[in-house]
């Protein structure tokens, strides 16, 4: 298959217009503090990128017509798209993975499907740029909120009936119907387990998912330790306290804390950076876990 950032995701990112938020810098700074959600997301993104880069080149044998290998490639592409959405430059991160250099090229059948999907996405994108169209209104209202993987409107659009990307998940009814691979090559028929061999696509998909799961679990454990560390004060890392408000001789301690905690409150609001990053982590975890479940009997 051809590795390109899913077109539906690309259109959403391209059409989204950033909306200025009060105290946005303080909120973002809080979210990046060691142990906070944005720090965890960055750690997972780095771990995934390192895992992909360490996989070597193309598989040592032809995978064309082999269904498990094709599914494994789609799984990695799906996980890469989700993680890329959490980055400031979505396309730069996705392109830096160079997935096309790690997995076998598309079969002719996949290329045909990709061309049709691209034409449909481009046609929709052109139509939705016209001021006043229903999709234009929807994008204008939801651009900032709905482009984040895991938001409520993203979940609505990700239903099997509404979102073709859902069909990439192994086992879905639409996956079985649309993505059923052509008849396997004789070599694959004779040895259906070869996709699990070191360097093949199934092995690579499992290793990428393991890297994500390990990074999430490690980050969560480290964050939990920080919460129990009485010497760690994230408030001090956001900015200096206001001496007029936080003079301990004139004001109770909790007044200073409430003032300093405002970036934390904003970050953990329903539309805050910490909340969004937490949803992103859940999305990454769920997809990685699905990949590991699909390859649970592999070495």
Curated annotation (Swiss-Prot):
Molecular function per GO: mating pheromone activity
The answer to keyword S-adenosyl-L-methionine applying to this record is: no
Q: Where in the cell is it found?
A: Secreted
Q: What is its main location?
A: secreted
Q: Where is the signal peptide?
A: 1-16
Q: Which UniProt keywords apply?
A: Cleavage on pair of basic residues, Pheromone, Repeat, Secreted, Signal
Q: What is this protein called?
A: Clock-controlled pheromone ccg-4
Q: Which domain of life is it from?
A: Eukaryota
Give the encoding gene's name. Answer: ccg-4
Query: Which species is this UniProt entry from?
Result: Neurospora crassa (strain ATCC 24698 / 74-OR23-1A / CBS 708.71 / DSM 1257 / FGSC 987)
């Amino acid at each position: 298959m051809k590795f390109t950032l899913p077109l539906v995701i690309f259109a959403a990112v391209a059409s989204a217009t950033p909306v200025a938020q009060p105290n946005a810098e303080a909120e973002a700074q809080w979210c990046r503090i060691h142990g906070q959600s944005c720090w965890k997301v960055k750690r997972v993104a780095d771990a995934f990128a390192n895992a992909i880069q360490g996989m070597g080149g193309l598989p040592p044998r032809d995978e064309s017509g082999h269904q498990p290998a094709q599914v494994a490639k789609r799984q990695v592409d799906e996980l890469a798209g989700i993680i890329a959405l959490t980055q400031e430059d979505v396309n730069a991160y996705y392109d830096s993975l160079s997935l096309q250099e790690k997995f076998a090229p598309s079969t002719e059948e996949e290329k045909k499907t990709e061309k049709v999907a691209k034409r449909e996405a481009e046609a929709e994108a052109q139509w939705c740029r016209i001021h006043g169209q229903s999709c234009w209104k929807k994008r204008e209202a939801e651009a900032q909120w709905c482009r984040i993987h895991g938001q409520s409107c993203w979940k609505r659009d990700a239903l099997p009936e509404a979102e073709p990307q859902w069909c990439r998940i192994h086992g879905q009814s639409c996956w079985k119907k649309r993505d059923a691979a052509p008849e396997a090559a004789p070599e694959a028929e004779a040895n259906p387990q070869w996709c699990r061999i070191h360097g093949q696509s199934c092995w690579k998909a499992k290793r990428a998912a393991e890297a994500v799961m390990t990074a999430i679990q490690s980050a969560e454990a480290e964050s939990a330790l920080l919460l129990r560390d009485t010497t760690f004060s994230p408030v001090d890392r956001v900015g200096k306290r206001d001496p007029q408000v936080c003079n301990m001789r004139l004001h109770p301690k909790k007044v200073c804390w409430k003032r300093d905690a405002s970036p934390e409150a904003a970050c953990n609001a329903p539309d805050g950076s910490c909340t969004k990053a937490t949803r992103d982590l859940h999305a990454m975890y769920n997809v990685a876990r699905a990949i590991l479940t699909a390859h649970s009997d592999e070495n």
